[in-house]
Regions:
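Catalytic metal-binding/acid-base residues of hydrolase active sites
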Residues: 8, 65-68
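Structural beta-sheet core signal
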Residues: 4-6
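A short helix->loop->beta-strand "cap" motif at the edges of active sites that frequently abuts
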Residues: 1-2, 59
């Protein structure tokens, strides 16, 4: 049986800074995006859509995003590029997946 998971959140501001590190025109990217947090919101919509599909299709869902958002040190779990995880972030991801497997498999 398939299992779905939501993605860990990203930091839109840090990701935009990372994208613009090599003289990319931040102002032009923002003209297209509207604001830096649109990056975060697009990824949030992706996570919400995955959860809706899992519910509709009766597919088990691992709520990775929610466990990250509950962490009061979220910024320490996301790398400087704003999109990848740090080692503590990968540890939290592993723990979340392992806990889910223990409870559901």
């Amino acid at each position: 049986q398939p299992v779905m998971m939501t993605l860990p959140p990203i930091d839109g501001e840090r990701y935009l800074d990372f994208l613009c590190r090599d003289n990319l025109r931040r102002d032009r990217i923002l003209d297209w995006l509207g604001e830096p947090q649109m990056i975060y919101r697009h990824q949030e919509l992706y996570a919400d859509t995955a959860a809706e599909i899992a519910l509709r299709e009766n597919i088990p869902l691992i709520p990775v995003r929610q466990t990250f958002l509950r962490n009061h040190r979220l910024s320490q779990l996301i790398a400087a590029d704003g999109i990848h995880l740090t080692m503590p972030g990968y540890e939290q991801l592993f723990d979340t997946l392992a806990d889910w497997v223990k409870k559901n498999i």
